[in-house]
Amino acid sequence: MASKDWYKLNFQIESDLEEIIIWKLNELGIFSFSFEYLIKTENKKEVNIWLPINEWDESSRSDFEKIICKLLNINDSINKFFDWSVIKEEDWLTSWKKYWAPELVGNHFLILPCWINLNEEFNDKQIIKIDPGAAFGTGSHPSTYLCLEKMEKILLSDKKVLDIGSGSGILSIAARLLGAKEVCAIDNDYLAINSTNSNFQLNFGNLNNLNTYLGSFNEVILKHQLKKIDFVVCNILAEVIKEMIPNIYKCLRNNGEVIFSGILNSQKDEIIKILIQNNLKLLDVSSRKDWACIYAQKAKNLT
């Protein structure tokens, strides 16, 4: 079977379980998925997940089913709860794209899949063009939405910005659109780095003002001596954020600001406590659905 073929997994959930499924998929590094309301119902959604065949053998798929069953609190012996099918690469490209649409974020941004023409009614928006390929989504996750919503309210003109966990590069692109003079993007997945570079090029025609780094945040800032950052945006999982906070503090200049997202509302108090312990001043907390975004600052009188 061709290595570029895909498994498509389909199942149905109660609509209020969407966020916990998204959280788990992100935790597992799975980014090719969609949710759709079932016809004539508002409380059920159909979940579609695409997984590359060459990376998911029978044992891996079985383990994945058990993870989802545990998450949904259902018996993993239920017949036909999961529907697996095989999608050829050329068919995957068609089936995947049909679930994407332009998305307005905040007051100023429009995330636009690159194969969709811009409607004239959006000419006054800051356009973020995205072609995520096989690995990354188009920014519809609430944590990305919260980051963009907060970023558009922050003065980034002529500032040095660090994007931790860049993924498809949406937040790096947004920072440049908002006037950042330099954007540093870090991700530990080479596919993400490729996607960030590709989408930045798609939006600006070049890679000027962008530096990308492959590796973990703690490794990269030590190796490349990233310092005196004006603004950090960190959209990853809470457990990873907790480990990064001391070094994020060190790489910020005085009065530098940071946004943390990818945090469930139930996790925000613990993150805030760690921020304060590391001499970061809490400025604001916002939320969307089950997710929180924390905005903080390194105070001027701190070293």
UniProtKB/Swiss-Prot annotation:
Function: Methylates ribosomal protein L11.
Name of protein: Ribosomal protein L11 methyltransferase
Organism domain of life: Bacteria
Database matches in NCBIfam families: prmA (TIGR00406)
Location of the protein in the cell: Cytoplasm
Enzyme superclass (EC): transferase
Keywords, sorted A to Z: Cytoplasm, Methyltransferase, S-adenosyl-L-methionine, Transferase
Keyword check for tRNA-binding: no
InterPro entries referenced in this protein's UniProt entry, alphabetically: Ribosomal_L11_MeTrfase_PrmA, Ribosomal_PrmA_MeTrfase, SAM-dependent_MTases_sf
MF terms in GO: protein-lysine N-methyltransferase activity
Lineage, broadest ranks: Bacteria, Bacillati, Cyanobacteriota, Cyanophyceae, Synechococcales
Gene Ontology CC annotation, any one: cytoplasm
GO annotation, biological process: methylation
SUPFAM superfamilies linked: S-adenosyl-L-methionine-dependent methyltransferases
Annotated binding of S-adenosyl-L-methionine, by residue: 144, 165, 187, 235
Catalytic activity: L-lysyl-[protein] + 3 S-adenosyl-L-methionine = N(6),N(6),N(6)-trimethyl-L-lysyl-[protein] + 3 S-adenosyl-L-homocysteine + 3 H(+)
